[in-house]
A protein has these predicted regions:
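Conserved G1/Walker A P-loop phosphate-binding module
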Residues: 109, 116, 121-124, 131-212
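Residue-level signature of catalytic and energy-coupling elements of molecular machines
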Residues: 33, 84, 122, 168, ...
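Conserved GTPase G-domain signal focused on the G5
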Residues: 164, 276-280, 295-305
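Conserved C-terminal guanine-recognition region of P-loop GTPase G domains, centered on the G4
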Residues: 41-48, 223-290
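Switch II of P-loop NTPase G domains
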Residues: 9-22, 208-230, 242-255
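Single conserved hydrophobic/aromatic residue that forms the stacking wall/gate
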Residues: 306-314
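Conserved P-loop NTPase architecture
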Residues: 1-154
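Conserved beta-strand segments of the P-loop GTPase G domain that flank and frequently precede/overlap
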Residues: 1-3, 34-36, 237-240, 269-272, ...
Length: 314
């Protein structure tokens, strides 16, 4: 633990903590260090030179996980766009041209394609990727128009990463979408039709999980995917009640919804993973229109889900 009045501009941490890390790196024979914050290019370079090992900041780690999870062409485009924006923002500190990106820690994606990461080629590639994403966005718009004409309500599943959105989608629709406890196991949106116990037919869409301190360029890159929540009629906010940081995660979701300008939608909070609790958790989310204790694993509460014109909780 180190308490500083300000973050060191060159190495993020102070000289004393840097010396401690040097000893730890040698003792553990470490090949890499992960920093749970975003580092500037100067800080990345300073730490790598001082510690003589690979440094990954929070954003680079998230990008690496995204690259490993991307399956569809759209997901891969969005990941590459976010990676290149990250690289572009750091070129000034690392020089006008970086060496070719190879495989290994922190370099998945553009490195595997042997991209030259100088400014000119990055700008050209970003322009191309944005054009491709615009085509995807237009295609999504056509699909949304078709859904609108069908007059079937659309509900978007949102939540902090690993809250159990895909598991709920599977439990509700009988589908077999990949559901994993891994971070960001879902990068691509999936829509399934569902008839609720009250007979109401809806379309249910899974979305990418949110996370605390999600960088803005990641939100921008995945905007076409996140727009599914923006254009939905209802929001089903899935919460992992077994997580000790549940309240923080819920706030992150609401902050992200606000940034996406969808916080005014009708929201039903699904307090998931009740099967992991010693006693049922009945908590009213006063920011939502309704709250319901559920378990995707056991089916608890799923038959009670109702989204027709919910009334704001008092």
């Amino acid at each position: 633990m180190q308490v500083r009045e300000a973050i060191h501009p060159g190495t993020y941490i102070g000289k004393g903590k840097l010396e401690e890390l040097k000893i730890l790196v040698r003792a553990c024979d470490a090949t890499g260090i992960i920093c749970d914050d975003e580092l500037s290019s100067i800080q990345l370079k300073g730490l790598e030179e001082a510690l003589e090992c690979k440094i990954m900041d929070r954003t680079l780690l998230i990008l690496d996980i995204f690259a490993a999870r991307a399956v569809s062409s759209e997901g891969k485009i969005q990941v590459e766009l976010a990676q290149l924006k990250y690289r572009a923002s750091r070129l000034s500190g690392l020089g006008t041209s970086l060496s070719r990106l190879g495989g290994g820690i922190g370099t998945r994606g553009p490195g595997e394609k042997k991209l030259e990461t100088d400014r000119r080629l990055i700008r050209t590639r970003i322009t191309q990727l944005k054009r491709e994403l615009e085509e995807v966005r237009q295609h999504r718009e056509l699909l949304r128009e078709g859904r609108k004409r069908s007059k079937i309500p659309v509900a978007a599943l949102v939540g902090y990463t690993s809250a159990g959105k895909s598991s709920l989608l599977n439990a509700l629709t009988g589908s077999e979408i990949l559901a994993d406890a891994m971070l960001f196991s879902t990068l691509d949106t999936t829509t399934r039709s569902l008839t609720l116990p009250d007979g109401q037919e809806i379309l249910l869409t899974d979305t990418v999980g949110f996370i605390n301190k999600l960088p803005h360029h990641l939100i921008d890159a995945f905007r076409s995917t996140l727009e599914e929540a923006r254009y939905a009629d209802y929001i089903l906010h899935v919460v992992d009640t077994s997580n000790p940081q549940m309240e923080l995660q819920m706030q992150v979701v609401y902050d992200t919804l606000r940034e996406l300008k969808v916080e005014d939608k009708k929201i039903v909070t699904l307090l998931n993973k009740q099967d992991k609790l010693l006693a049922p958790m009945v908590v009213k989310d006063f920011r939502a229109d309704a709250s319901l204790a559920v378990s995707a694993k056991t089916g608890q509460g799923l038959s009670l889900i109702h989204i027709s014109e919910p009334t704001r909780q008092e």
